[in-house]
């Protein structure tokens, strides 16, 4: 009995669904050059303290645990000492890149960093990722306020 139902289910799954009116069949190529990417809004009048608070939050909420841990510990350790230019470079790094996996692969050395992101801040992040102090990074650090 089961054997006789198997071809029927296979035909149903393999049948042409071109008559479907839903968008379930649309495949998006995320590496395609025609994919429109939203531009990150520039905030020219944002005070430095507020910018650091925003970056601290954004470093913690990346959408992938690997970057949550790496960037939150990095921001906790270094962001408070960044000047305005370094803060702007870090902002561009974590918000100018459209794919968080790229940041992870660059920081861990899996992929080469593009020239526009090869900065002192990226080098500092790469050193942080190497974790030469052998610091346990199983959870995000407590929130710190910079205002």
Swiss-Prot record:
Record keyword Chaperone present: yes
InterPro entries according to UniProt: SDH, SDH_sf, SDHAF2
SUPFAM superfamilies membership: YgfY-like
Keywords from the UniProt entry: Chaperone, Mitochondrion
One cellular-component annotation, GO: mitochondrial matrix
Keyword Hydrolase: no
Biological process (GO), any one: mitochondrial electron transport, succinate to ubiquinone
Pfam family, one: Sdh5
Top-level division of the source organism's lineage: Eukaryota
Localisation: Mitochondrion matrix
UniProt family annotation: Belongs to the SDHAF2 family.
Additional record remark: This protein may be expected to contain an N-terminal transit peptide but none has been predicted.
Subunit structure and binding partners: Interacts with the flavoprotein subunit within the SDH catalytic dimer.
Function in brief: Plays an essential role in the assembly of succinate dehydrogenase (SDH), an enzyme complex (also referred to as respiratory complex II) that is a component of both the tricarboxylic acid (TCA) cycle and the mitochondrial electron transport chain, and which couples the oxidation of succinate to fumarate with the reduction of ubiquinone (coenzyme Q) to ubiquinol. Required for flavinylation (covalent attachment of FAD) of the flavoprotein subunit of the SDH catalytic dimer.
Name under which the protein is recorded: Succinate dehydrogenase assembly factor 2, mitochondrial
Organism in which the protein naturally occurs: Drosophila grimshawi (Hawaiian fruit fly)
